[in-house]
Amino acid sequence: MELPATSGLNAQPGNAEGTTASTRPATALSVAERYLEALPLPAEARAALRREAGIEPADKDAVALAKLHRALARLDAAQTASIEGSVPAYASIGSRLDAAYGTPHAGTATPEPAPPLEHDTAGRIHLDTGPEPARRSMVPWPWVLGPIWRARRAIGRLFSGGTAPVPYEQPDSPDPKGIWRFVGARRRLTLLALMIAQTVAATWAMSSVLPYHGHDWLEAIIIALFALLFCWVSAGFWTAITGFLLLAFHGDRFVISRRAAPNAPIPDDARTAIVMPICNEDVQRVFAGLRATYESLQRTGHLEHFDFFVLSDSGDPDIRTAEADAWLHVCRALDGFGRVFYRWRRHRVKRKSGNIDDFCRRWGGRYRYMIVLDADSVMSGDCLTRLVQLMEGAPSAGIIQTAPLAAGRDTLYARIQQFATRVYGPLFTAGLHYWQLGESHYWGHNAIIRLEPFIKHCALAPIPGKGSLSGEIMSHDFVEAALMRRAGWAVWIAYDLDGSYEEMPPNLLDELGRDRRWCHGNLMNFRLFGSPGFHPVHRAVFVTGVMAYLSAPLWFLFLLLSTALLAKHTLIAPEYFTQPRQLFPIWPEWHPEKAAALFSATATVLFLPKILSVLVLWAKGPRRFGGAVHLALSMVIEAVFSVLAAPVRMLFHTRFVTAAFLGWKVHWKSPPRDDAQTHWGDAVRRHGLHTLLGLGWAALVYWLNPSFLWWLSPVVGALIVSILLSVFSSRVTLGRGMRRWRLFMIPEEVRPPRELRAMRKHLRQAPPTPDFRLAVVDPVTNALMCAIGTARFPHDPKLLEVRDATVLQALAAGPDKLTSKQKLVLLSDPLALSALHLAVWSSDVHRAAWLPANALASKAAA
């Protein structure tokens, strides 16, 4: 682990310039000297502190260090009886921070601002990481699920005198219906008619392919599954066709981006909070993206309307320390004190939605809007200001969701997914907007939210009941959109708005890990399908959320039953009389030409949207995607890859759905934010059974009927090569090689936006982050962690005993044996943390146990 630049732990003990190492035995003076060397002070300041401290050679280490901290804090005799005097390391917090950040570094043209330290009414030193609270009440309404609960509520209304709805069902938007709502209803009826007509035609064709045309019970089940799956695919097909027509010929007159002019002024009272909820994320990546977004917004000239909040739920003490240090460095680099804030939540309640709720309760009264970013989000200043302008121009809009563009990854898998979302995504988002209008999706990030109705209507109560599909809502975004629309506020997708970016999972296994959480969350959300007041569109969103994962076991069952039907016709004599009192036999019929036609039609439904997307890009200029030929070739390779990956996803999603219904727990971990590659051992463990299943399935079908294996080869073949597919698609070298060949190119790679270039630059130049050990040992990091905390009840004798016991326990256990909970307790208590800091420095044994390895190496070299 590297030390931060402000740390002096690697300095050689000696004179002020660090030229001559001291070889004398450890004394009180030498310990104090080492501590002074760990502070980034000029030689004159160190010499003055030595004189002021008045350390005697006979002083014990603890006494010498206490004198040094009192000298740092400029304590007089009257102050030594105060809390600062009894914990001298706590009293010196301000001086230590001033030593690191208060004096301009040599050679800097513009000195970075010092952290604004203050004393509260109790005289405690504090570095404010958040603005003054403007608290709001945010109370969730309990869910009413099922006919029994709804009947009880209706009876309660009857006896209470009237049938007036409860307050949360009353729309309070200035325009709860709007003309677009009736247009949207007609459009969705058209979509439903197209889906039904196409599904009926395909189902009839499927029945004509089967030997008994659906009269056999096994065939009837297969036809029913086919109809359900084809209807699901048909919805996406018509959405893409509609998006193609919009992008190729004309836009939608109801598009939300037409609600305000690009130069519309932003009122002074239209304050917006840009919030980034994080939990155990890559700290350097988080703050690099935040800084790039801040700088882009600053260039627009509208920075005064926005504040930034990093809302941390991190439970790792090392990451917690790194976050605070990164926040301080970003604030100094941007002069962002008072505009960039950091809040760490002690109790992680309701995961991400609870994190947002906590912000709304603390500071919701200060802002009109809130823009939610993910940990990997980057947004341009133009996009941010445009969102506020659109909110001002559409007073009935509750949420406006952008369509984030994926960029920034180098693995082959991620680059294929980036290409797919960049090329095909615009068709689907434009089509989705056409069908849904102001009753659309919210994806949880890169969106702007009107805070007043969000606070009033979108608090999430736990889902009642027992089991894994009850309790705290995991996938909160769809539910919040449904609640917002239930209150009469519109939810829009600004699909034509540029400047919104995110990152993709680097490999197949990481994407599937994310899918498991989403699967569980969508299955939970479906329990809210019958909750009163929801708009039919959002009930349909709950259905599509479930079908995104339930379609996998249905497809798997369809394939298994098709194999069983093959075995039945191969191993069992055909039945000619399948109905009672049947006079004439039913002859089994096989029509390979009809099967081929149905296969071609299904392939058209699946792949035509990809071809149409390429046609649109050809018309608009394919150079941004590597050229016309490379674009077409990339589309073909991506289509082949999607065919190979689909059966693998099918088996994983089948397992996820089964696990959710069986009550298996899901651990919500932050996804990787770097180009993580899949190792062979991980691939064999996760895909080994898939390979065996593919081999066994292929052997069985070949034994039953070799000609049928050709029809099943896309499935069993993909399972057989799943290990190779997972490993090689995660390779960074292959991804970069494809870029050299101009394959899977996207505009963000051909000509990267300024925001993404800035993010990568800040990530490369990010200083090393400290960990929990340095929060205890390093004078500067310790001062920072103490300054951002609050010394609660400093004079309570019982708490003083608890603090003393906590410090003694930490000294006895050492950093490696302390639990994360114990470390977080220390980080949350400035008095205990500063006392531990002093105790560790007062003992050679404890200092050796707590110092990082490279600092020990430097010390040994001295």
Swiss-Prot record:
Keywords noted in UniProt: Cell inner membrane, Cell membrane, Glycosyltransferase, Membrane, Transferase, Transmembrane, Transmembrane helix
Classification via SUPFAM superfamilies: Nucleotide-diphospho-sugar transferases (SSF53448)
One term under GO cellular component: plasma membrane
Location of the protein in the cell: Cell inner membrane
Entry EC number(s): 2.4.1.-
InterPro entries linked: Glucans_biosynth_gluTrFase_H, Glyco_trans_2-like, Glycosyltr_2/OpgH_subfam, Nucleotide-diphossugar_trans
Function: Involved in the biosynthesis of osmoregulated periplasmic glucans (OPGs).
Main subcellular location of this protein, as a coarse class: membrane
GO biological process, one term: glucan biosynthetic process
Recorded GO MF terms: hexosyltransferase activity
Annotated TM spans: 188-210, 545-567, 597-619, 626-648, 708-730
Pathway: Glycan metabolism; osmoregulated periplasmic glucan (OPG) biosynthesis
Disulphide connectivity of cysteines: none
Compositional bias (Polar residues): 7-25
Gene from which the chain derives: opgH
Protein family according to the UniProt entry: Belongs to the glycosyltransferase 2 family. OpgH subfamily.
Membrane topology, as annotated: Multi-pass membrane protein
Region entry Disordered, spans: 1-25
Protein name: Glucans biosynthesis glucosyltransferase H
